[in-house]
């Protein structure tokens, strides 16, 4: 049982996922700070000096804080866009890596097979003459 768990836990995909979650959490904090400290104050200035996070509406005894929802929505959009750009960059890098691997010099086996093919073609051409 322990051996199976160890194989599962230390496979590349699980470790990659763990690193991704940790980096995602750290990145989320950076984006939250960017939105809270820079974007929302700028949006507040643009719409007339209003603190966007404090926007709310009272409905009966309830206070609906739609400003906080707006701020969280902007954070989500920025995080999603940044992750989109990151994944797009990674995919472009992988495609570039794959093309360089495809262009790599032929192996010894491939060279030998090419020579054999060429020799067979020459033999066939000589027989037809």
Curated annotation (Swiss-Prot):
Q: Establish whether keyword Transmembrane helix is in the entry.
A: yes
Cellular compartments annotated: Cell membrane
Q: Which Pfam families match?
A: MscL
The way this protein sits in the membrane is described as: Multi-pass membrane protein
Query: Superkingdom of this entry's organism?
Result: Bacteria
GO CC aspect terms:
plasma membrane
Q: Which SUPFAM superfamilies match?
A: Gated mechanosensitive channel (SSF81330)
GO MF annotations for this entry?
mechanosensitive monoatomic ion channel activity
Which InterPro entries does the protein's record reference? Mechanosensitive_channel_CS, MS_channel, MSC/AndL, MscL_channel
Which regions span the lipid bilayer?
A: 8-28, 30-50, 67-87
> Has keyword Lipid metabolism?
no
According to its UniProt entry, what is the function of this protein? Channel that opens in response to stretch forces in the membrane lipid bilayer. May participate in the regulation of osmotic pressure changes within the cell.
By sequence similarity, the record places it as follows:
Belongs to the MscL family.
Q: How does it assemble?
A: Homopentamer.
NCBIfam families per the UniProt record, alphabetical: mscL, PRK00567.1-4
UniProt name for this protein: Large-conductance mechanosensitive channel
Instruction: Give the organism the record lists.
Output: Exiguobacterium sibiricum (strain DSM 17290 / CCUG 55495 / CIP 109462 / JCM 13490 / 255-15)
């Amino acid at each position: 049982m322990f051996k199976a768990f160890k194989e599962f836990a230390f496979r590349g995909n699980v470790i990659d996922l763990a690193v991704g979650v940790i980096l995602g959490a750290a990145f989320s904090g950076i984006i939250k700070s960017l939105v809270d400290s820079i974007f929302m104050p700028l949006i507040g200035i643009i719409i007339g000096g209003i603190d966007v996070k404090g926007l709310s509406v009272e409905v009966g005894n309830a206070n609906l804080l739609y400003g906080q929802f707006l701020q969280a929505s902007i954070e989500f959009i920025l995080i999603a866009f940044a992750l989109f750009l990151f994944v797009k960059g990674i995919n472009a890098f992988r495609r570039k890596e794959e093309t360089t691997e495809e262009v790599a010099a032929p192996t010894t086996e491939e060279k030998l097979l090419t020579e054999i093919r060429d020799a067979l073609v020459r033999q066939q051409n000589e027989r037809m003459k």
